[in-house]
Amino acid sequence: FLPKMSTKLRVPYRRGTKDYH
């Protein structure tokens, strides 16, 4: 499992904001 994928999947509005958008 990757911490980056889990993070954006769990909290896409916290750390995946710049990555998700």
Curated annotation (Swiss-Prot):
Transmembrane segments: none
Entry keyword annotation includes Secreted: yes
Subcellular location: Secreted
Superkingdom classification of source: Eukaryota
GO cellular component terms, semicolon-separated: extracellular region
GO BP annotation list: defense response to bacterium; defense response to fungus; killing of cells of another organism
Expressing tissues: Expressed by the venom gland.
Keywords: Antibiotic, Antimicrobial, Cytolysis, Fungicide, Hemolysis, Secreted
UniProt keyword Ribonucleoprotein, yes or no: no
Functional summary from the UniProt entry: Antimicrobial peptide against both Gram-positive, -negative and yeast. Also induces histamine release by mast cells and shows moderate hemolytic activities against both human and rabbit red cells.
Additional record remark: Minimum inhibitory concentrations (MIC) are the following: E.coli standard strain (MIC=12.5 ug/ml), E.coli drug-resistant strain (MIC=15 ug/ml), S.aureus standard strain (MIC=1.2 ug/ml), S.aureus drug-resistant strain (MIC=5.0 ug/ml), B.dysenteriae standard and drug-resistant strains (MIC=7.5 ug/ml) and C.albicans (MIC=15 ug/ml).
Name of the protein: Antimicrobial peptide scolopin-1
